[in-house]
């Protein structure tokens, strides 16, 4: 197989057959993987190791999803529940930072080893759980190059008519370029579930009614105030002129009624960009005023500052080389509430518009904090020391390549993961056929806010944010990765998998997607060997192979 040179952010690497310029060509593979998330990479690596010929087909030019787009402060949960190739990834990250040349802007000994629920570096284990985006991308590229994985970038699935099915199986998928990818089996590794939906597989968008599966943490969460992403007891007026309803609502407020706790809807938790910032002036791009900037969008934040809000920098999470993975924190933050509702089912053109709108909102927020006179001077001065990291996302002016799609479509599969699986409460009879675990989750039930509304008392408040602790790691059932057999027999979905909104809030972490991608490819290898539907894979054999490959399937195997 011919190797094509693929330049990436300041260095040259080699990836097998990265196709950007061929059109109207037919390709044949054992396994076609659509998407660029970490699950796509782990699936391709595992498929190759098991003797299959995979191809990754992805719209993105950078493979690795959010792990290469700013999410470097890993939501690891219990690190002992992360095994197999996913753990190998974090070991490779650790080894990358053992090289002196990795520390360009900071001495290694000056790095504070803090992480999300764990140390950034676990020296005894040889793993590292925080990293710069370009380092993650280099690891993924080297991983794929070692196996000569065929990667086709810049390829958008024709979602209207590109999926050809015969006798309940996908035969081929076509992209908007006119290329056709034929395969025996397929994996949807997108955050949105685009291939799954185009193949006619049932899915959900938004929040189920809590009564459907007997869940407490699903549906409308009005009155639930977890974390600190809300307006506390400040009694902030939602109106442009405080206390005057005739003046109209401030920007970024949903005019709908508070609603009923537990009631389902199609609202989607908020997205943001995980921005890689730096306070090192040698490597900093100052925040600039975005197109269409309007400080009125951030009026509610100004009112929070007037009430004494002082947590602006709470989620400027430090990674190596004086950089951050900057997430959201506080009552009005980087999450653009309401901007996510359309995304899962939107056209590519509409998603591009929404991505720009998110960027303008978020860049406007940073500019507002650094410049607006309503912001306390000490906060403005502190914010002005921050900017985008010049050596990250170089092709994109220091801004992340991808928005953080925290939740898109969710498949309705053979089994539906619910909060009961995560919390250890009795399963609901409607969850479907259970096979057994093919990986573990351990993060809390975590949903970001869904909307900002006016309370019955006439004040502004947020709704949808939950953070419910998971006592122990739990198994993620193989049945949640496969569609109902009547809908498709040769597709596995390790990212937009079958889970309720509540359960997905725990599952939806990058290392979990990575380990599920490996499990999906392992299942495909057995299905291909036996000529079976993915729903008919021998689970005991699958589980045995996963354990042999270092995957963690039960709590007794977990080690911190």
Where are these regions (language model features)?
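Bacterial N-terminal signal peptides
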Residues: 10-20
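Aromatic pocket-lining residues of Rossmann-like dinucleotide-binding sites
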Residues: 47
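Flavin (FAD/FMN)-binding glycine-rich loop and adjacent Rossmann-like elements that form
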Residues: 137, 153, 171-172, 179-185, ...
């Amino acid at each position: 197989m011919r190797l094509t040179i693929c330049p990436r952010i300041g260095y040259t690497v080699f990836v097998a057959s990265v196709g950007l310029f061929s059109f109207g060509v037919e390709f044949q593979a054992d396994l076609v993987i659509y998407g660029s998330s970490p699950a796509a990479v782990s699936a391709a690596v595992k498929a190759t190791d098991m003797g299959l010929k995979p191809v990754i087909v992805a719209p993105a030019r950078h493979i690795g999803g959010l792990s290469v787009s700013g999410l470097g402060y890993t939501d690891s949960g219990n690190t002992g529940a992360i095994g197999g190739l996913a753990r190998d990834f974090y070991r490779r990250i650790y080894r990358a930072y053992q090289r002196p040349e990795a520390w360009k802007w900071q001495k290694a000994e000056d790095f504070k080893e803090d992480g999300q629920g764990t140390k950034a570096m676990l020296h005894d284990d040889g793993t590292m759980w925080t990293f710069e985006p370009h380092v993650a991308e280099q690891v993924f590229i080297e991983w794929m190059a070692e196996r000569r994985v065929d990667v086709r970038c810049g390829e958008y699935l024709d979602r209207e008519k590109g999926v050809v099915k015969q006798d309940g199986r996908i035969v081929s998928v076509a992209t908007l370029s006119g290329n056709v990818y034929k395969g025996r089996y397929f994996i949807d590794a997108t955050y949105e579930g685009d291939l799954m939906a185009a193949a006619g597989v049932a899915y959900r968008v938004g929040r189920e009614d809590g009564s459907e599966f007997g869940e407490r943490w699903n549906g409308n969460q009005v009155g639930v105030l977890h974390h600190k992403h809300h307006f506390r007891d400040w009694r902030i007026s939602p109106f442009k002129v405080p206390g005057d309803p005739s003046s109209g609502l401030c920007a970024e407020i949903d005019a709908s009624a508070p609603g009923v706790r537990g009631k389902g809807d199609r609202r989607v938790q908020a997205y943001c960009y995980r921005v890689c910032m730096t306070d090192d002036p040698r490597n900093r791009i100052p925040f600039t005023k975005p197109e269409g900037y309007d400080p009125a969008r951030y009026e509610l934040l100004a009112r929070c500052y007037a009430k004494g809000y002082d947590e602006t920098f709470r989620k400027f999470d430090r990674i190596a080389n004086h950089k951050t993975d900057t997430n959201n924190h506080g009552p009005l933050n980087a999450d653009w509430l309401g901007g996510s509702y359309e995304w899962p089912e939107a056209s590519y053109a509409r998603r591009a518009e929404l991505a720009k709108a998110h960027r303008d909102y978020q860049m406007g927020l940073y500019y507002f904090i650094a410049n607006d006179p309503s912001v306390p001077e000490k906060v403005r001065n502190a914010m002005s020391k921050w900017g985008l990291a010049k050596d990250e996302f170089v092709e994109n002016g220091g801004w992340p390549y991808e928005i953080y799609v925290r939740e898109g479509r969710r498949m309705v599969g053979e089994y539906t993961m619910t909060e009961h699986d995560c919390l250890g409460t009795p399963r609901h009879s409607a969850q479907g056929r259970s096979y057994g675990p093919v990986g573990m989750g351990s993060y809390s039930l975590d949903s970001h806010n869904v909307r900002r509304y006016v309370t019955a008392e006439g004040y502004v408040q947020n709704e949808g944010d939950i953070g419910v602790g998971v006592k122990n790691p739990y198994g993620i059932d193989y049945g949640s990765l496969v569609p109902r057999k009547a809908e498709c027999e040769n597709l596995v979905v390790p990212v937009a998998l079958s889970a309720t909104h509540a359960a997905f809030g725990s599952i939806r972490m990058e290392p979990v997607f990575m380990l599920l991608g490996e499990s999906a490819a392992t299942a495909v290898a057995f299905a291909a060997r036996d000529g079976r539907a993915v729903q008919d894979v021998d689970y005991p054999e699958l589980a045995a192979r996963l354990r042999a490959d270092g995957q963690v399937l039960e709590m007794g195997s977990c080690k911190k």
